Amino acid sequence: MTNKKILFILHLPPPVHGASMVGKYIHDSEVINNTFDCHYLNLALAKDLNDIGKGGMRKLKDFYKQLKQISLLIKSIKPQQCYVTPNAKGGAFYKDFLVVMLLKIMRQNVIVHYHNKGVATRQNRCLDNLLYKMFFKNLKVILLSENLYQDIKKYVKYKDVYICPNGIPIHENLPTVPQKEFNILFLSNMMEEKGVWDLLEACTILKKKGKPIKCHFVGKWSDIKEEQFIDEINKRELTEYVFAHGAKYGNEKDVFLQKTDAFVFPTYYNNECFPLVLLEAMEQGLPCISTNEGGIPSIIENEKTGYIIEKHSPQIIAEKIEYLMEHPQQCANMGKAGRKKFLNEFTLDKFEARIKNILEDCIITA
């Protein structure tokens, strides 16, 4: 029997972010490519992280070419299903609205897979409300977590929603490298909304209490610049406590995971949905401290695999870190529970199986 044809219109690296990494996992998946006759088109117009959300003539021209390419692909391959990873709000949504409308005009079955959020923040605007009604009509939607349904509840019935948590490849379980101090790791782009300053303030609190910590910030410089961050470390007299390493990948990143006692990610990023960095930390048996942003409460089990805290709460971050320092056995147990949860729910194999089943169901019920 001939495999059903699917056109995947998704984000691929560069730039590297959660949605593009998941796009790459789908693109490279033997399970998905062997199950379906897959065709791929890269939806990304941004060349790097700083380019995300910006306009310009180049992007306009590239988008026009994209629409033409989509139209030609639909006519030539005649897919049974189209899969799109759209943006939820703003100018990027208006662009993706046109993509989905083109697919609908061409009588395609469409499923959208959200890696961001923000519909609910714009649904009271007249234009956006009208466009959302048109956009979501007769659409199936994949969400990363039950927690994210509230974002689209106004427009989508729950029966048209699939829940599919992200997954990442299983890596070798790295041996722990014992350290004298309690080591904390932040692993993400160096953006204010990722909670960088909140963690730095927590480090300041712990330093004033005489706690022997080392906090490592690993990630690409973004709206927080290196000089700015170093100046802040110096101002707070944290040069022996806090270290900035820039972006690290592969084995270089693994070195930090090996030396870490607790992973802290106090994000309040407005597009945060299901951060892959938490899965990486859980895979390595690290207790995680993060916020109630997006789908994070469905990743971390509060007080079992780590802690869910309020956003903008450096004092609470400091308290949780101090507790883990003073209760090493509980710290280790949380890490073990996190790794078990990762292996049960968040591996790439589990993700691929979920996506395959969802797409098969969509084609059957179309």
What do these predicted ranges mean?
Residues 228-248:
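Nucleotide-activated donor-binding/catalytic signature segment of Leloir-type glycosyltransferases, i.e.
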Residues 316, 323, 330-345, 351-354:
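A short, well-ordered alpha-helix in the C-terminal region of glycosyltransferases
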